[in-house]
A protein has these predicted regions:
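Short, Asp-centered acidic motifs that coordinate Mg2+ and/or phosphate
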Residues: 47-48, 71, 207, 235, ...
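Glycine-rich Rossmann-fold phosphate-binding loop(s) that bind the pyrophosphate
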Residues: 158-159
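Rossmann-like dinucleotide-binding domain for NAD(H)/NADP(H)
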Residues: 90, 94, 224, 233-322
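Rossmann-like adenosine-cofactor binding region
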Residues: 57-60, 181-276
């Protein structure tokens, strides 16, 4: 008898085809989200679950499991929506999909740097609202932003994505400085300058890009105390996790022009982000699309499926969390 697998949302066609061949699978072809209660009730009938960040797999979720579920193949790098300690206590394996989305997230990071610097959101709205013609063409003011060439980019979290962002930024002749738990080896560091203390790095940055996982240590790492150290002309970029930012502190800094701008792809309480962000002209926002390329989403789906296959073949998981 084939193991039963539940897929909570629509994933890439190629991955779904493999699941249909090798497992007794229930797909979500219409991509209609299950309610929290529906998912708890349904998953008790399955041996494996392929989940996404939209699924709330908290302690209560695991407390209501009846012993059949053996593995969760999560489609995504971050897994802060999964109570991994409860999974471990229930002897349920959890995997994620790291590394396959590094390039895509790095690209979005550079996009946010450029969009925030060159006021792309404001310029786009000017054209779409058909009000461009109503503005006097003052070449010193109309949609004038900042160049990024030759500026200093500070990277918080110099892991794989942070390193790729640094490589992309070097094409703009940007100077790279970084704060990380540990100093990188010379071959990985390249020409970047290491700061063992975040507070000493920030005053030297024109741009600050955050690339840390969501942990208790990184929760609200961007707060009012830290934002005071940003230069007034600086831009903050976040493509990591919304929980790393104190929304009130960042919004206050943007409202009062304490920093030049922000480019954000992630938020607290997604998709119900703080509406004040939408009122800020100096904040360029995206709906968490860092990994949203055909190539990356296929790779993420395939890795999640490969982890499921490994588990039921009694092989080590390719990217085990717990």
């Amino acid at each position: 008898m084939k193991p039963k697998i539940l897929v909570s949302r629509k994933i890439s066609d190629g991955a779904e085809e493999i699941l249909k061949k090798e497992f007794d699978v229930t797909l979500n072809l219409e991509d209609k989200p299950y309610t929290y209660e529906e998912l708890i009730k349904l998953v008790n009938e399955y041996d494996g679950l392929i989940s996404t960040s939209f699924d709330k797999l908290d302690k209560n979720f695991f407390d209501n499991l009846k012993g059949k579920l053996k593995i969760i193949g999560h489609v995504g790098v971050g897994y802060d929506n999964i109570h991994t300690q409860s999974a471990k206590e229930k002897n349920i394996k959890v995997s994620n999909t790291p590394n396959v989305l590094n390039d895509a997230v790095a690209e979005i990071t550079i996009l946010l740097i450029l969009a925030s610097s060159r006021r792309v959101g404001e310029a786009y709205n000017l054209v779409k609202s058909n009000t461009w013609k109503d503005h006097r063409p003052d070449i010193t003011k109309l949609m004038v932003g900042n160049e990024i060439t030759g500026k200093t980019l500070g990277i918080i979290g110099m892991g794989r994505i942070g390193q790729i962002v640094a490589d992309r930024a070097r094409a703009f002749k940007m100077k790279i400085v970084y704060y990380n738990r540990n100093k990188l080896s010379n071959d990985l560091e390249k020409d970047a300058t290491y700061y063992p203390d975040l507070k000493s790095m920030l005053p030297n940055c024109d741009y600050v890009s955050l690339h840390t996982p969501a942990t208790s240590e990184t929760k609200n790492i961007i707060n009012s105390e830290i934002l005071k150290l940003f230069p007034k002309h600086s831009v903050f970029i976040n493509t990591s996790r919304g929980s790393t930012v104190d929304d009130n502190a960042l919004i206050e800094a943007l409202q009062n022009k304490k920093i030049y701008g922000a480019g954000l792809d992630v938020f607290n309480n997604e998709p119900n982000l703080d509406k004040r962000y939408l009122e800020l002209e100096n904040c360029f926002v995206l709906p968490h699309v860092g990994s949203a390329t055909h190539e990356t989403r296929l790779a993420m789906s395939m890795l999640a499926v490969d982890n499921i296959k490994c588990f039921f073949s009694q092989k080590p998981l390719l990217s085990e969390v717990v």
